[in-house]
Amino acid sequence: MAYRKLGRTSSQRKAMLRDLTTDLLINESIVTTEARAKEIRKTVEKMITLGKRGDLHARRQAAAFVRNEIASENYDEATDKYTSTTALQKLFSEIAPRYAERNGGYTRILKTESRRGDAAPMAIIELV
């Protein structure tokens, strides 16, 4: 089996994977179900590999998948302006250089206790 269906149609599944991948790149750690964590591991690894390549084509490929969300906002008192960093900028400027010497294995999945409502196996996925 090449992928998990996760009980959704293909468009819903792709949207969910894009959202979770973007959230992981922004927050660097999220809590989700084990099945979802194992699926987004694949996409996050691909995005970080694209970030390490760093050329224009890699940036465009990553931009086609990662949502255009603000990762952080800073206020500069000298210029009296706010500067914001998107998830894509964070991927290429902060996350990718951190793994320059590492060949794969950028994420870690830690199993936690089951969810209370439906006993779904939960996991924390984080960037190493």
From Swiss-Prot:
Any Pfam family: Ribosomal_L17
Entry similarity comment: Belongs to the bacterial ribosomal protein bL17 family.
Gene: rplQ
GO terms for MF: structural constituent of ribosome
Entries under NCBIfam families matching the protein: L17
GO biological process: translation
Subunit organization: Part of the 50S ribosomal subunit. Contacts protein L32.
Protein name as catalogued: Large ribosomal subunit protein bL17
Matching Gene3D superfamilies: Ribosomal protein L17
Record keywords: Ribonucleoprotein, Ribosomal protein
Annotated source species: Streptococcus pneumoniae serotype 4 (strain ATCC BAA-334 / TIGR4)
SUPFAM superfamilies with a match to the protein in the record: Prokaryotic ribosomal protein L17
A single GO cellular-component term on record: cytosolic large ribosomal subunit
